């Protein structure tokens, strides 16, 4: 049982220690119950998660499934709602430190100079960082633009709505006003 084991560490040290915790589980097959409020830590090391809210289990299952459930979109907090997408590093541009991450709906380009081609990982795209357009944007500095189909719209709270967009079979959430 690891109950918030990295809570006292600064962000840089957390990212140094997390691979070692992940390696213990993978190399030795030792099950770890890892308690955390950090979505980033969970994405780095967990395969299965149990979401506890209000003193009870709200959801359990594979990390991607739990964190992509529409009814739990806000479980991470309003500013952290988003999509978890499994990707594979398929290209690296060392001159610029840009990695190409492929998924069912296309390719993300992100700054990630330490990735290795072939490496599989999960990324989280915050819903508040996803813009929607009726036409393909031009003359913008945005690296990641995808075509998709609006699959659903649901009320958030306040002036926002959550929009699910199907991008090649992958659901990506957007939170718009």
Regions found by a protein language model. Give the residues of each.
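Catalytic Walker B motif of ABC-type/P-loop ATPase nucleotide-binding domains
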Residues: 1-4
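Short aromatic-glycine-enriched beta-strand elements
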Residues: 96-99, 159-164
